[in-house]
A protein has these predicted regions:
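Conserved donor-nucleotide/metal-binding helix-loop-beta segment in metal-dependent transferases, i.e.
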Residues: 117-143
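Conserved alpha/beta core of the MobA/IspD/sugar-nucleotide pyrophosphorylase nucleotidyltransferase superfamily
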Residues: 171-226
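Short beta-strand/loop segment that forms part of the nucleotide-sugar
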Residues: 55-64
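Short, glycine-/small-residue-rich phosphate/pyrophosphate-handling segment
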Residues: 155-176
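Short aromatic-hydrophobic micro-motifs that form the base-stacking/packing surface
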Residues: 110-112
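A short, N-terminal amphipathic alpha-helix
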Residues: 38-55
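N-terminal nucleotide-binding beta1-loop-alpha1 segment
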Residues: 1-25
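Short phosphate-binding loop-to-helix
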Residues: 71-108, 169
Length: 226
């Protein structure tokens, strides 16, 4: 039986800093609340990443001032290799992280962010399995981007010529893959937590066992009772 290639799970995260995280939630929440929401999301994603089997290495790639972290986040990040994001835009930062992990011997690299704290862990497992037969896998998000990208070899094409943060990220990426004849697999869609209505949706449809830290926080926020 053929042995599976070594696999790495990468979490992309911004260090929790007041006024710099989850700013679009500011329509409804204070800066302190936005910070608390982000920290809860980060905790949930770290627990998610720790729970998915099949990975030989787990990494946390930080942006921002990660030198000083809240104690609970510092503790939760201990099982991960802590690294720094490098690059002028998100595409270059993801490419550089993948390049680093492939150089260290990984044969499959999966990258997730912190915007989908209730993502079912099996989605990440599906991505890992898909990379046994295709060079690239994407998890589409409802806002036109993607919540996950994975690759079984280093490539630049998916990370160039994309307007990051726009609603055209996924469509442009698929166009690039087709133009360059790069095979890929699409996972089932999911949603990001970017705006207040996304939090209301999550609170109303919380799947059992998902996003426990965020669920606990939302139950304490008076704004949800208004």
């Amino acid at each position: 039986m053929m042995a599976h290639s070594p696999a790495t799970l990468v979490v992309f995260a911004r260090a929790p800093e007041k006024g710099l995280v989850k700013t679009r939630l500011g329509e409804r929440f204070s800066e302190d609340q936005c910070l608390a929401i982000y920290e809860a999301m980060l905790m949930d994603v770290l627990e998610l990443a720790s729970s998915v089997p099949g990975f030989d290495r787990r990494c946390l790639y930080w942006a921002g001032a990660s030198e000083v972290l809240p104690s609970r986040i510092r503790e939760a990040s201990q099982p991960f290799h802590n690294c720094r994001q490098a690059g002028q835009d998100l595409g270059l930062r993801m490419h550089n992280a993948m390049r680093e992990e492939f150089a260290l011997g990984s044969g499959r690299v999966v990258v997730i962010g912190c915007d989908s704290p209730d993502l079912p862990p099996e989605r990440v497992g599906q991505a890992l399995h898909a990379l046994e037969s295709v060079p690239l896998v994407l998890g589409p998000s409802e806002d036109g981007g993607y919540y996950l990208i994975g690759a079984s070899r280093l490539m630049r094409e998916p990370f160039e010529g994309v307007q990051w943060g726009s609603s055209s990220v996924l469509a442009k990426t698929l166009e690039i893959l087709g133009k360059n004849e790069i095979g890929f697999s699409l996972l089932p869609g999911w949603y990001d937590i970017d705006r207040p209505e996304d939090l209301y949706r999550l609170k109303a449809s919380m799947r059992p066992g998902g996003a426990g830290h965020l669920r606990g926080l939302l139950s304490t926020l008076r704004v949800f009772a208004s």
